[in-house]
Amino acid sequence: MKMERSLNLFEEAQRYLVGGVNSPVRAFKSVGMEPLFIQKGKGSRVWDVDGNEYIDYVLSWGPLILGHANDQIVNAIKQVANYGTSFGAPTELEIEMAKAVVDAVPSIEMVRFVNSGTEATMSAIRLARGYTGKKKIVKFEGCYHGHVDSLLVSAGSGVATLSIPGTPGIPEEFANLTIVLPYNNIDAVEETFKKHGDDIACVIIEPVAGNMGVVAPSKEYHQRLREITKEYGALLIWDEVMTGFRLAYGGAQELYGIEPDLTTLGKVIGGGLPVGAYGGKREIMEYVAPVGPVYQAGTLSGNPLAMAGGLRQLQILKEKNPYPDLDRKGKKLEEGLRYLSEKYGIPATVNRVGSMITAFFTDKEVVDFETAKSSDLDRFAKFFRLMLEKGVYLAPSQFEAAFLSTAHSDEDIDETLNKAEDCFKQLL
């Protein structure tokens, strides 16, 4: 595999960008190699600056559910850009986008757009504290909710990938207000609320974890969590930055039939542009300025490019309803990987929900962060490098999801599994 130009660019990038990247996992540190520099993408494929072509299962970490450079989305962005890129003032597109979100997500009556998933979770936490008058928050080990001070405790995603236990720069006083519990363990939740229930403002959770790899709790777990938070007057926040509009048009809420108090969104709702959102019941959302006392603002929030790209993507998803076919393709990939694991005796637990999938290199059932961490990281790193050499681009971390798009064909999946078989042979 040619990498000369990528290597040269990475060397240059390290002189100007911290670590040569703008997000840590992109540095490929955990897989023992230098990163690719991507030049272009189309459909299910990306090409790097050395001309290598890959079937892409990263999809910009999830937003590109219709694949790269979808013509309708690109044209929508171009059309709006002709009139200006940002105004810092209300536009009609913001209303149309808000209507689409409220129409789709069962629990959302009002929404506020921001510029990233991190902004969305940060703002939702602030709102929950302002609304309830309480200080403590509950999160779950291995769940990643962006790089917010109060939420980086025992986090997944890059924090897990790089084996960072915490991070300097977060005062102990902040961390002390965050209670971290094991994911998928309702007994721990019940015990915590018995001790601290009167002080807990909110519980924030990925309804299907994707940032420790894909881990799905039971519907009963979510139902009990909903009951407990209601009982103690704490808000339940579902972080659907990853699952929103990906697992179903109404997100994980549509799958589970459970309505949280607040929901955070990102990724898919931007059509590949920077965007985030948080929303919920009108009574709660009207605590946000300028109607209420909880302040939150943003220079580029609701900018026309993100609204145009996101709105067109949501319109296509609503019109086409690709979710059954995405699930079918996900199942095909899941079953193929599981078959290869069994055929070659390579321990692997394959977890999937819809078009999100992770193959953990462990013989344990992966139900939480502790079992996810039992994965053989050296074996994953070797598998990643072998697949990359054969033209399959996976997330450079054991603790991330692979994503499918409508642009991935059955032929893409067949090709991926054929190449995976060659790689499994080399893992023996």
Swiss-Prot record:
Keywords: Cytoplasm, Isomerase, Porphyrin biosynthesis, Pyridoxal phosphate. Its EC number is 5.4.3.8. The keyword Cytoplasm applies. It holds the Pfam family Aminotran_3. It is an enzyme of class 5 (isomerase). The modification N6-(pyridoxal phosphate)lysine is found at residue 267. Its main location: cytoplasm. It comes from the Bacteria. Its cofactor is pyridoxal 5'-phosphate. It catalyses: (S)-4-amino-5-oxopentanoate = 5-aminolevulinate. Pathway: Porphyrin-containing compound metabolism; protoporphyrin-IX biosynthesis; 5-aminolevulinate from L-glutamyl-tRNA(Glu): step 2/2. InterPro entries: 4pyrrol_synth_GluAld_NH2Trfase (IPR004639), Aminotrans_3 (IPR005814), Aminotrans_3_PPA_site (IPR049704), PyrdxlP-dep_Trfase (IPR015424), PyrdxlP-dep_Trfase_major (IPR015421), PyrdxlP-dep_Trfase_small (IPR015422). The keyword Isomerase applies. GO terms for molecular function: glutamate-1-semialdehyde 2,1-aminomutase activity; pyridoxal phosphate binding; transaminase activity. GO terms for cellular component: cytoplasm. It is found in: Cytoplasm. One of its GO terms (biological process) is protoporphyrinogen IX biosynthetic process. Homodimer. Belongs to the class-III pyridoxal-phosphate-dependent aminotransferase family. HemL subfamily. This is Glutamate-1-semialdehyde 2,1-aminomutase. It comes from Persephonella marina (strain DSM 14350 / EX-H1).
